[in-house]
């Protein structure tokens, strides 16, 4: 069984992430969404909240599971019996960053391959950082995130402001 992992922080998950998840799910027998703890990043949502939002977002995709993880991605891939990492590339800056990561992953686990997918055109500009910034400054984000995520972001931002 070909198992792939799509790792990320997903803070929050965007329509761009979900588009990539749906496309990758068609390519593999099983796709594991690896939600990284990322202690070095200040996140809007906790790891458990991000996992829950992704599970709610992906509930219609039977071959997709969502798992939180901390530590090295290559160790998580080994735990999940995954042989492929799926990564999204929006810009040349993404490519440079991902190329460095892929080189390190190959050193740590040579049998782990990376598959890079470019976003659908309507999502090429979209990032979690932009969504958070727009939401924090009172902008409307409904068109950029799944419905359950929109509600959660609005509630979280409102709670921070109170």
UniProtKB/Swiss-Prot annotation:
* Site entry: Transition state stabilizer: 17
> What's a GO biological-process term for it?
coenzyme A biosynthetic process
Its needed co-factors are: Mg(2+)
Per the record, the pathway is: Cofactor biosynthesis; coenzyme A biosynthesis; CoA from (R)-pantothenate: step 4/5
What are the GO MF terms of this UniProt record?
ATP binding; pantetheine-phosphate adenylyltransferase activity
Gene Ontology cellular component list: cytoplasm
Q: Any keyword Hydrolase?
A: no
The protein here is known as: Phosphopantetheine adenylyltransferase
Which sites bind ATP? 9-10, 17, 88-90, 98, 123-129
- Stated role: Reversibly transfers an adenylyl group from ATP to 4'-phosphopantetheine, yielding dephospho-CoA (dPCoA) and pyrophosphate.
Which reactions are catalysed by this chain? Answer: (R)-4'-phosphopantetheine + ATP + H(+) = 3'-dephospho-CoA + diphosphate
Q: What class of enzyme is it?
A: transferase
What protein family is recorded?
A: Belongs to the bacterial CoaD family.
Matching HAMAP family, A to Z?
Answer: PPAT_bact
